[in-house]
Amino acid sequence: MKRGFSDSPSSSAPPPSSRFKSNPEGDSQFLEDETTKNFARKVADHYSRRTNQTLEEREASPIIHLKKLNNWIKSVLIQLYARPDDAVLDLACGKGGDLIKWDKARIGYYVGIDIAEGSIEDCRTRYNGDADHHQRRKKFSFPSRLLCGDCFEVELDKILEEDAPFDICSCQFAMHYSWTTEARARRALANVSALLRPGGVFIGTMPDANVIIKKLREAEGLEIGNSVYWIRFGEEYSQKKFKSSSPFGIEYVFHLEDAVDCPEWIVPFNVFKSLAEEYDLELVFVKNSHEFVHEYMKKPEFVELMRRLGALGDGSNDQSTLSADEWEAAYLYLSFVLRKRGESDGARRSGRRKNGKMNLSKDDVLYIDS
């Protein structure tokens, strides 16, 4: 076993304790350099450039069943942990693809933030029902606020003081963008902790570092992949060794057909868990996507949800299903749930709803300077 990472695939067992040395100055300052800001902007520009697809275009995607599987995983997480009237904070909310999932959970209030201006505008029009999205749904039942800014850099507790505390925070397929530096990782977790109520939950999905590193070490070169994805590491990782004392800023280039083509960063889960504990966020579970599917497909209600979403076909007319390459790509990801220490007093802050609106104009979007 090489230093810093386990060679075994992810499991639901708690990861080992972190062996990296924490920032001795704690989280008193989160300083960003220009290189980090440029990386964040590059990622934002990538997602802003992605246009909304029609239903026909979406169904023709070479990874349509992988997308549906990921939607199923997010839907299951939301159904497991969201309660009626919950206040939700959606970090890196993108184009609002999860709005309908939250609506079905009958939440009471929604705040979404994303760094990409184009994505936030698409989210606004989707929420308003102005765009002809494939959901064909015109009205959501909860008031909302939208913010445009880098949630891994700005202090959100000051900006959202009147909206907090939140019952649930979600960050789907984006947490790894905070792992460029320890400062950004700390800011991300500090924001989550500061805005969650005691007993509140943080749900998310992100790349599984154990799987990626295992595949890299099994490969002949510095690239892994198949017909739907590839991952390429730089020559600085030619020895395929990663120091446990330097778990931030481990960059690779990730390409996923019809979805992603930009730099990403390894998140060693043992470090993520240890850092989260510093911010009073305790691990409830972590599961690789394969394990997640096998476990929750044992429950009839989630089997029916899978059928409706069509990731494995609909069981009748649509006999298509995930390809072997899509299933392998799914193995690259994990789901996690953290809970903030403490017990909630059970009180609901109905006043926070006044900060949201049922229809959002462009002027209603709050732009946050980094």
From Swiss-Prot:
Chain positions recorded as S-adenosyl-L-methionine binding sites: K74, A92, D114, D150, C151, Q172, F173, A174
Enzyme class: transferase
Catalytic reaction equation(s): a 5'-end (5'-triphosphoguanosine)-ribonucleoside in mRNA + S-adenosyl-L-methionine = a 5'-end (N(7)-methyl 5'-triphosphoguanosine)-ribonucleoside in mRNA + S-adenosyl-L-homocysteine
GO cellular component: nucleus
Keywords, in A-Z order: Methyltransferase, mRNA capping, mRNA processing, Nucleus, RNA-binding, S-adenosyl-L-methionine, Transferase
Domain mRNA cap 0 methyltransferase: 61-341
Ranges annotated as biased composition (Low complexity): 1-11
Coiled-coil residue spans: none
Region feature (Disordered): 1-34
Function description: mRNA-capping methyltransferase that methylates the N7 position of the added guanosine to the 5'-cap structure of mRNAs. Binds RNA containing 5'-terminal GpppC.
Molecular functions per Gene Ontology: mRNA 5'-cap (guanine-N7-)-methyltransferase activity; RNA binding
Superkingdom classification of source: Eukaryota
Residues given in the record as mRNA binding sites: N70, N71
Gene3D superfamilies per UniProt: Vaccinia Virus protein VP39 (3.40.50.150)
Protein family: Belongs to the class I-like SAM-binding methyltransferase superfamily. mRNA cap 0 methyltransferase family.
Protein name: mRNA cap guanine-N(7) methyltransferase 1
Alphabetical list of InterPro entries matching this protein: mRNA_G-N7_MeTrfase_dom, mRNA_G-N7_MeTrfase_euk, RG7MT1, SAM-dependent_MTases_sf
One Pfam family, short name: mRNA_G-N7_MeTrfase
